[in-house]
């Protein structure tokens, strides 16, 4: 596919609504989760300029850490336009399930499990893209979160 053909497709694709389960995102201009970037003010700003969706910074899936100031800041959804999305990261099925429920109780309508971050410090904890090395673990994580 050439750049010119991508440009021709872009307006149609980007402006088409996207449905994720029971949530509708007005367009496909999605701001990816970025550590140190996609905090609450940044997400609200992006949405005010037309982004259909903006995902929180990665939040570690250990609810024991959620009382920390940094964790509370990352999971702050005050004033955000729905649908609200939180990204969580971890490798323990029970902790991931608890973190998912915590984010939902905190206002998130969509919870994204980080399976793409290549950062060394994330992968060393068998999280992010390192999860893709273990299909059985991914299945256990998804089963715990969905069920």
State what each model feature region is:
Residues 101-121, 127:
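A contiguous, low-structure linker/loop signature
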Residues 64-71, 120-142:
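Active-site-adjacent beta->alpha loops and helix N-cap segments on the catalytic face
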Residues 27-28:
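Extreme N-terminal starter segment of soluble prokaryotic enzymes
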Residues 75-83, 132-147:
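Alpha-helix-loop-beta-strand connector modules within alpha/beta enzyme cores
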Residues 12-19, 34-109:
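Glycine-rich, positively charged N-terminal anion/phosphate-binding segment
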């Amino acid at each position: 596919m050439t750049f010119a053909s991508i440009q021709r497709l872009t307006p149609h694709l980007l402006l088409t609504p996207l449905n994720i389960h029971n949530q509708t995102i007005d367009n496909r201009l999605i701001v990816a989760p970025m550590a140190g970037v996609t905090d609450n003010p940044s997400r609200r700003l992006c949405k005010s300029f037309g982004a259909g969706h903006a995902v929180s910074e990665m939040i570690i899936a250990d609810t024991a850490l959620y009382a920390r100031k940094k964790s509370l800041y990352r999971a702050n959804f005050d004033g955000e336009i729905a649908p609200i999305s939180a990204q969580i990261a971890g490798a323990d099925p029970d902790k991931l399930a608890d973190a998912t429920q915590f984010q939902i109780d905190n206002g998130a309508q969509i919870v994204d499990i980080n399976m793409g971050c290549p950062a060394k410090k994330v992968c060393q904890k068998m999280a992010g893209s390192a999860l893709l090395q273990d299909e059985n673990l991914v299945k256990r994580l998804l089963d715990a979160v969905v069920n």
